[in-house]
Amino acid sequence: MIGLLVFKEKLKQFYGKYNIYIVPVVKFLVGLLTFWLINANVGFMSKLKNPLIPVVMGLVASFIPYGVTAFLAGVFILIHVAQVSLEIALVIFVFVLAVTVLYYGFRPGDGYLLLLTPLLFFLRIPYVVPLVVGLSGSLVSIVPVCSGVCIYYILM
């Protein structure tokens, strides 16, 4: 048990020392994986299927908050779906608008949950985020997790 406490303190010191580098790298990886998975699973527009687009969007995501990244991912999905069917794009637009209103109305600090939930669903570990949020998050944190689950099933 003492070993875990020592490891925790060393991890806190490392994060405190290199916070300025760790946060943008994690945001880049989350953004890259998000846009790459959208391209791989939705990918109807050939101009956006370029492998460089997710890398550029990941770089952009490393400098903006998670909420804006989630909104850009929604717009990215809308552009792909509008290539096939404007009616379905309109339905998804209404859903993205409702998620945005709920998200910013309740708790804008939990944007990473909105991105991580569908991301981990695609990586075949679906119940990690809902379980962790249920055990350690607040009651309002359920909104981005539920929205992330709905987004996953829309993409599938």
Regions found by a protein language model. Give the residues of each.
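C-terminal halves and exits of single transmembrane alpha-helices
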Residues: 88-113
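Hydrophobic alpha-helical segments embedded in the membrane of multi-pass proteins
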Residues: 49-55, 92-94, 128
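Generic transmembrane alpha-helix motif of multi-pass integral membrane proteins
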Residues: 54-64, 72-80, 98-103, 114-120, ...
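Short, Lys/Arg-rich, polar N-terminal cytosolic tail immediately upstream
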Residues: 1-17
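Transmembrane helix interruption/hinge and helix-loop junction motifs
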Residues: 46-48, 63-67, 82-87, 105-108, ...
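Alpha-helical transmembrane segments of polytopic integral membrane proteins
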Residues: 31, 35, 113-116, 125, ...
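Generic multipass alpha-helical transmembrane bundles of integral membrane proteins
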Residues: 129-156
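Hydrophobic transmembrane alpha-helices
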Residues: 20-74, 81
